[in-house]
Amino acid sequence: MGDDAERNERELRELRLEVDEQRRDISESDDRERRQDTLITRLRDEAAVHDHDAAALRNRLEAAEHELVDLRAIRDALTPPELPQRPGLDLAAAFLPAVAEQVSGDFYLGAEGPQDSTVLVVGDVVGHGLNAARRAAFARTAFAATAPFSDDPCRLLSWANTALIERAGITSEFVTAGCVTYLPDERLLRWAYAGHPRALWLDNGQELVAPTQGTALGIGPDLGLTESSQRSVAGAGVLLYSDGLTEARGADRRFGIGGVRAALGGLSWPSPAEAVAILRARVADFAYGALTDDLCLLAARSR
C-alpha cells in the first residue's frame, strides 16, 4: 500500500507539472496570438493610411493632369496658331510664356468686323494660372462675339467690360486691352485703350496716342474711353503688345520702348511676320531667355 501511495503521489505531481506546463504553453500561445492580433491590426491601420495617402496622391495627380489639359486648351484658344486672312491687311502674332507650359492672361484677336473691317485686340489679365487664363478666354470670346457688329474700338471695349462685369461682378482681377480697327475702303485706323500700353507704328516705334488711356476692364462701368483715328497711307503698320515686351528685364534695366524702337529701327519696311520675329529674338536675348512676364505681340500692315 505504501508503494502504491508513493507511486500515485509521484504520478499526481508529474501530472500537475504537465498541466502547469500546458498552462504556460497555452498562456504563451495566447500572448503570441495577442501580439499577432496587435501586429495585424497595426499593419491594417498602416495599410489603410497608405491606401488613403495613395488615393489622395492619385486624386492630386488626376487633378493636376486635368488642369494641364485645361491650360493647354485655353492657351491654344487664346493664342491660335493662325490668324484669319483679312482684306487689305497682313497680320502676324506671337505669344511667349514666361514659364513653360504655363498659361497667363495674355491674349490676342484678329477678327472680322462690319463692312470688311478688321478688329485687332491685345489683352492682359492680371495674374497667372488657370483662373487668369479662363478670364482671358472669356474676354477674348466677348471681343470675338461682338467684333462683327462694330468697328468702333470704344464700343467694343465697353461691350467686353459689360460682359466681364455681368459674368463675375466688379473684381480686382482686371483686364487691360488695346483695340485697333481698320476699315480698308477708307484706309481708316481707329484705336482706343482700356488701361493698356499704347500701340506703336511699326516703322518708327512711335505711339498711337489717344486722348485718354482709359480704365481697365472689369473694375467698374465707366471706362473713360476716348478714340483716336487716322487715315493711313498704303503700307502703314501697327504693333499691339502686352507689357511683357517693354517690362522684360535685362541685367540692369528693362527692355522698354527704347528697345522696341531699336529693334524695329534695324529693319527696313518690315512685314508683320518679320517685325514679330525680330522682337521675339531681341527681347529673349535681352532677358537671357528668362522672361519675367508673358508677352503677346500682334502686328498688322496695310496693303
Identify the residue ranges that each predicted region occupies.
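Long, heptad-repeat coiled-coil alpha-helices used as oligomerization/scaffolding rods
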Residues: 5-8, 15, 19-22, 26-29, ...
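C-terminal catalytic subdomain
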Residues: 157, 228, 232-240, 245-303
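Intrinsic-disorder/low-complexity, polar/charged segments
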Residues: 2-4, 151-152, 270-271, 290
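Acidic/proline-rich low-complexity IDRs
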Residues: 11-14, 42, 156, 188, ...
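… and, occasionally, acidic/histidine-rich disordered N-termini of signaling adaptors
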Residues: 46, 52-237, 289-303
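Activation on terminal intrinsically disordered regulatory regions flanking enzyme cores
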Residues: 1-3, 8-11, 15-18, 22, ...
